[in-house]
Amino acid sequence: MRYLFVLLVIAGMVVSVLALRLHYSTETAPCSINEKWDCGIVNHSPYAEIRGVPVAAIGIAGYLLIGVLALMRRRAFLLLASLAGMAFALYLTNIEAKVLGVWCLYCVISQAVIAAITLLAIGWVVWYRSGAAERRDRLRKKVGKTDPPGG
């Protein structure tokens, strides 16, 4: 399960790096499709930074944290981090929809990635707390396979 998180984290980091690159670029955005889909407008708007820090850089840091927590199997902290990321993504989505009236393809992909991570984190915590992990570990012990604690 944790490797699925890592794959999603890599996808989120890639789109965040692309958005960060675009934030500092003066060239036309490759994802500027029409007046409703323009990454350039979104990434150069006043909402693209928080206290001078690009939102895309915050995304990179968030995805990195989520990746580390997944690899360490820190389910509760992973769930908290993904819920915080989801709340931040919803805040940014609201700005795109209601304030700017323009969508960024990179941002929408990142929003989908953090939503998937959050759903997986919820599922992982529920699965683990249901006792399924303990039953799996007992079964593996019977057949001679071992797995580190925390599954």
Roles of regions detected by a PLM:
Residues 1-149:
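Membrane-interfacial helix-loop segments of redox and metal-homeostasis proteins
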